[in-house]
């Protein structure tokens, strides 16, 4: 691919609407000792797989987003903000299903609460078949496919298998083990997800040393050529298999509260 060519990317997975409710609190409620927040502004943005799609567009890719939404106001708002971001929308509307919505309450600049509305119900058979048909058409012309699996019900075994032949498959999943049979090019778990993969529990230990010691096992369990593990503000650790096997460089980065990489 030439340097001037646009990357064709397909993002498939669990889409959601992220909302931030901004306000200030200067008194307590009469009915309970809780602050009364005066709502001053609301900010809506693509979340989950939709956020990944918007980020890829911002990096210069041409993106097609495949996923599931409900026939509700939240789904309509998600499509609106995706269009503003320049994302190609291929979202299947399932009547009676609720679009995932995460609301963050920000009081005087401080994140104080998050309210989630989600639907983890099994996809109807017709919806799975339609999703598979849309994926087949989308993946055929893609340079890269990104799967965002946050447990929202999109990735049935059949949908995962349909992505096994993708030209370059990158997986961001809360549970990466089910993706092993797809042999992804890369998976992007956070530290806690890697610990669960290894059968342990996250504790107050040296995270970098722990991940480095288990690098080969992590690659084996995921079936991926590359594993990129996010460590919040500590940075990112890269595990690579093959001729260039090893553990990559870790760099620090600033994480804004409420917008971190593990906030899905």
List each language-model region with its residue ranges.
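Short, flexible hinge/linker loops that cap or flank conserved catalytic cores
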Residues: 2-3, 263
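Conserved N-terminal subdomain of the carbohydrate kinase-like
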Residues: 8-9, 17-146, 157
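Structural motif
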Residues: 10-12, 114, 143-146, 170, ...
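Conserved phosphate/ATP/ADP-binding segment of small-molecule kinases
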Residues: 150-252
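A short, aliphatic-rich alpha-helical micro-motif
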Residues: 4, 139-140, 181-182
């Amino acid at each position: 691919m030439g340097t001037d060519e646009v990357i064709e990317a397909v993002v498939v997975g669990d889409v959601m609407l992220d909302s931030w409710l901004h306000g200030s609190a200067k008194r307590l409620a009469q009915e309970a000792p809780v602050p009364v927040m005066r709502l001053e502004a609301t900010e809506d943005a693509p979340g989950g797989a939709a956020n990944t799609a918007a980020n890829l567009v911002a990096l210069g890719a041409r993106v097609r987003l495949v996923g599931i939404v409900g026939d509700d106001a939240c789904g309509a708002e998600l499509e609106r903000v995706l269009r503003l971001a320049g994302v190609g929308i291929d979202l299947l509307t399932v009547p009676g299903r609720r679009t995932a919505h995460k609301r963050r309450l920000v009081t005087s600049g401080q994140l104080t609460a998050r309210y989630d509305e989600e639907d983890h119900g099994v996809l109807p058979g017709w919806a799975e078949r339609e999703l598979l048909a849309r994926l087949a058409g989308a993946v055929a012309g893609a340079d890269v496919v990104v799967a965002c699996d946050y447990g929202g019900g999109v990735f049935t075994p059949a949908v995962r298998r349909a992505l096994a032949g993708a030209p370059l498959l990158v997986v961001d999943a809360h549970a990466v083990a089910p993706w092993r049979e797809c042999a992804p090019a890369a998976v992007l778990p956070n530290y806690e997800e890697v610990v669960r993969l290894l059968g342990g529990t996250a504790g107050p230990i040296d995270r970098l040393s722990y991940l480095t010691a288990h690098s080969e096992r992590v690659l084996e369990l995921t079936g991926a050529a590359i594993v990129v593990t996010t460590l919040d503000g500590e940075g990112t650790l890269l595990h690579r298999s093959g001729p260039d096997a090893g553990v990559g460089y870790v760099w620090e980065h600033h994480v804004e509260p409420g917008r971190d990489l593990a906030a899905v």
